[in-house]
Amino acid sequence: MTTNPTTKDHRHFIDIFAPGTARGKTLTAKAIQAHCRAAGLEPIVFRFESAAAAGKCPNGEVFINSDKLVDALPDPGGAISILDPIAKAITDSKGTLVILDWAGGQSAMRGDWYVASTFDSLVAEKGFVGWSFVVTTNQAASMIQAAAALDETAKVAQRLRRVLVLNCLHGGFDEFPPGSAEAKAYADALVPQAAKCAARLTLPLIARHGWEPFSAAGLSILDVLNLPVGELAEITGLSLMLAATCRTSVAAWWAEVEPQLERLLPVK
């Protein structure tokens, strides 16, 4: 696996994708947002979701109706009207970070859009460093799908630097039982694609399900780290002790993740 040269340029375009659901894509997006905001940089976040999930889009993020986009892709004019805000964020902004957060399982639509728009070329032309973060857990199907997504990204968006995100939600990636489906998927599918990536990001497990009550309450990572415990307890409905314990778990997780992000995206 190669290491991508770091850059102090604050103009980053970040595509975040997982081929399926419950892989950790949203947590990855929140971690990148927290990293940027801790440095005083406010990212522009576009979130692809179905109409049914529109209400889950956090305040301040731009909702893009993926249902309408599927229907519009065959018509260049229709697709442009839906996706134009993303292009404007790239062409009109200075010193910004633009995050594209795809809903899980949108591989075909994502690939079609990159092919039709050649958006990675626009990103490069406007002086942005382009990234594609592909998220996987250590389950066999997830690793196989992530490997395919990395391969597809290399074909449809060649100018984006690929990052493999290893989410340890169900365990690590270093001790699979010999002969297991996971061992085969890791060795035969994921490792060859990982070797072609610019970098890797590892998300350890957040102990004691510490993130779940905060996520359900709509809190950001920086909210959890910076708000008084009493306020966290009031917002989430947790007891003071449980709120403090959950925050400790999130803080320990962030202490491992944030240095990785700073090496990868040195925005401070």
Language model feature labels by segment:
Residues 58-63, 86-101:
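Switch I (G2) and immediately adjacent beta-strands of P-loop GTPase domains
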Residues 1-7:
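Pre-Walker A adenine-sensing motif
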Residues 108-205, 211:
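Conserved catalytic-core segment of NTP-binding enzymes
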Residues 68-78, 171-173, 205-213:
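A short acidic, often aromatic-flanked loop/helix-cap motif at beta-alpha or helix-coil junctions
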